[in-house]
């Protein structure tokens, strides 16, 4: 396997700031993590399973968000953490740079059946046909439709779809509300730039991969269609300003107040609605491509072992334990029980492992009379098997910045879609050239 350059000048400059490992004098039984936190029972229960099975290990969970530059600097300095928890969309980049180790021997030692993992999450942790990480949660994107608002416009919520792009402008006009020229209701939020991979895929294009180009006419069309939908709703400045007023995580959210008719959204938001607005009247359906086929992308994090990890064997034990179906079921039960004690609903647990999900949704999940979860959770579970993922790239972070920046320029009226995506492609090519890949 050809390893791409790991250490840039900027990383060398900060490498002396200190690493993230256990320190040379630490006991051999220490295990230091990076990028992982303990926010709820999904984390704490699984960590407890590992601690019980490995009482001799001094597990040090360094809570906090993953910092890419800090991680690469620590690897360059020869002082990395033992195990890292990072966005799996970027793991291919770290593998290409030689910053993480292949897990073939680790997975074989623990008899981990990769066939249990769904294709999309697994593809993101695979580089040159070798697996460099084990994926964890799997968040999807679904359409959440505000039934009263849509019915008020004389439409059937169940029939609302993203299949016919030529019909979307008229749909937006019908659902959007202005008062004295001021936006009062968003008819349809296309969620760009962040959901551009979904719109591009719906048009038959990927944003990364050997044959992908950001200036592909199909990508340009996706940018044009979605940004024009925003323009029809007052333009980006007023659209975003109005959206920023939403009580997204409260009882007076945009579905409860009628400030939004429909949008694609991350599946985790169903839990928010189920908790804060359990009686809100919504329909949850798949996003569809231009042929009418259900379409969604899977995102989440993965565990990996950095190059230079002092305790790769223990790190392997930790990863295998944290991602085992039995451990997931234990965590799901703990999460369900903690939420029940607080008077809150449990919206299921969705992982990259189909065996774990099947058990959780058979043994643990029960929507009760919560309407949001009753219809939303089965939709998400059914979509998991057919999700796609943005292909891994040696320059994943740079590509993300390139296409998001391009869409933002169009939204702000600085460039037209063709010109902006052409610039994004040039930026992507420079980034790929810097890391020596495609």
Write out the residue ranges for each language-model feature:
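Short helices/loops that flank or line small-molecule/ion binding pockets
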Residues: 69-80, 97, 149-150, 169-178, ...
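C-terminal lobe and pocket-closing loops
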Residues: 269-279, 292-297, 305-401
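Glycine-centered hinge/linker elements that transmit conformational signals in sensory
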Residues: 172, 211-244
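Short helix-initiation/N-cap motifs at beta->coil->alpha
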Residues: 63-71, 89, 162-169, 239-253
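Short amphipathic alpha-helical coupling segments at ligand-binding clamshell hinges
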Residues: 42-46, 221-222, 310-322, 420
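Hinge/lid segment of periplasmic solute-binding proteins
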Residues: 88-141, 283-285
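Conserved C-terminal helix/tail region of periplasmic/extracytoplasmic solute-binding proteins
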Residues: 374-438
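Conserved N-terminal structural module of periplasmic/extracytoplasmic solute-binding proteins
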Residues: 2-93, 110, 245, 326-330, ...
């Amino acid at each position: 396997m050809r390893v791409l350059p790991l250490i840039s000048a900027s990383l060398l400059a900060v490498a002396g700031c200190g690493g993230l490992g256990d320190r040379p004098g630490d006991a051999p039984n220490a295990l230091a993590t990076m990028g992982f936190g303990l926010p709820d029972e999904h984390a704490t229960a699984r960590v407890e399973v590992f601690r019980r099975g490995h009482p001799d290990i001094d597990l040090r969970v360094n809570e906090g968000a993953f910092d890419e530059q800090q991680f690469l600097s620590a690897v360059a300095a020869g002082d990395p953490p033992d195990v890292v928890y990072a966005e799996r969309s970027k793991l291919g980049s770290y593998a290409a740079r030689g910053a993480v180790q292949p897990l073939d021997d680790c997975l074989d030692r623990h008899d981990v059946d990769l066939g249990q993992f769904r294709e999309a999450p697994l593809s993101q942790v695979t580089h040159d046909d070798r697996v460099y990480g084990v994926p964890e949660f799997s968040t999807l994107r679904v359409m959440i439709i505000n039934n009263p608002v849509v019915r008020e416009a004389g439409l059937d919520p169940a029939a609302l779809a993203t299949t016919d792009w030529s019909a979307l402008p008229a749909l937006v006009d019908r659902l959007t509300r202005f008062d004295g020229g001021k936006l009062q209701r968003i008819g349809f939020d296309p969620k760009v730039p962040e959901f551009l991979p979904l719109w591009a895929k719906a048009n038959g294009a990927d944003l990364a991969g050997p044959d992908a180009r950001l200036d592909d006419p199909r990508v340009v069309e996706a940018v044009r269609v979605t940004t024009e939908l925003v323009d029809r709703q007052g333009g980006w400045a007023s659209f975003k300003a109005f959206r920023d007023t939403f009580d997204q995580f409260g009882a007076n959210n945009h579905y409860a107040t009628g400030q939004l008719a429909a949008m694609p959204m991350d599946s985790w938001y169903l839990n928010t609605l189920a908790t804060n607005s359990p009686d809100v009247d919504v329909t949850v359906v798949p996003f569809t491509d231009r042929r009418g086929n259900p379409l969604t992308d899977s995102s989440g994090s993965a565990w990996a072992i950095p190059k230079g990890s002092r305790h790769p064997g223990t790190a392997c034990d930790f990863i295998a334990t944290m991602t085992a179906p039995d451990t997931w079921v234990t965590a799901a039960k703990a999460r369900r029980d903690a939420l029940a004690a607080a008077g809150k609903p449990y919206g299921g647990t969705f992982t990259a492992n189909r065996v774990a999900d099947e058990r959780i949704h058979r043994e643990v999940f029960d929507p009760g009379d919560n309407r949001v979860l009753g219809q939303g959770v089965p939709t998400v579970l059914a979509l998991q098997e057919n999700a796609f993922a943005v292909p891994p790239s040696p320059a994943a972070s740079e590509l993300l910045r390139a296409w998001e920046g391009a869409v933002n320029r169009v939204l702000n009226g600085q460039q037209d879609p063709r010109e902006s995506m052409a610039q994004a492609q040039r930026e992507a090519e420079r980034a790929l050239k810097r890391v020596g890949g495609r």
